[in-house]
């Protein structure tokens, strides 16, 4: 609450920011959300976005998807339909924000894998916003993931910004942005925040 009330929304207002990109894992549990958590999410995040006319692009992350093989049934879609300012992505998509072409890549799973990799190959967009599991990056401070996709398939892009891992790290053109605030003890004394993408 303190992060949203005292940091995030005041910054957006002060700098006239009218678009937010959420890189996934907005919700934590695949199968359910408590009423208390949903009420808090609406009060702290979704309602202020709506009240301030902020268009919000939300990628489906692995924690948002109910099943492991498809993103189609997901908490983002089910819990944000009442907000016309929120656009949910469970399939890869190309969009344009402020004159900048972006490839939006939600969690890559069996259902969207072929389409995702074809779009990575064919797109003319130079920037990817994703929820990617790439090997060789730190999930948490000091814990390197040895599984996942090879990051070299993204070499053609100028910049890749991705969610999924809590630890902020950069290697070449790939930027794991980390989570905005501490969520577990693994995040203790690990830099947190949000990022501004100036189009």
Features from the language model and the residues they span:
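Core catalytic region of metal-dependent phosphoesterases/phosphodiesterases
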Residues: 1-94, 153-157
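A structural signal for the main folded, soluble domain(s) of proteins
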Residues: 5-12, 111, 118-119, 168, ...
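Glycine-rich phosphate-binding loop signature in dinucleotide/nucleotide-binding domains
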Residues: 11-16, 121-124, 196-198
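Receiver (REC) domain switch-region micro-motif
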Residues: 20, 128, 160
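Active-site glycine-centered loops adjacent to acidic/histidine catalytic or metal-binding residues
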Residues: 24-25, 61-62, 131, 163-164, ...
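Active-site regions of enzymes building and remodeling cell-envelope glycoconjugates
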Residues: 85-86, 100-102, 125-126, 172-177
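Binuclear metal-dependent hydrolase catalytic cores centered on His/Asp/Glu-rich metal-binding motifs
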Residues: 97-152
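Conserved beta-sheet core of the metallophosphoesterase superfamily
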Residues: 134, 140-199
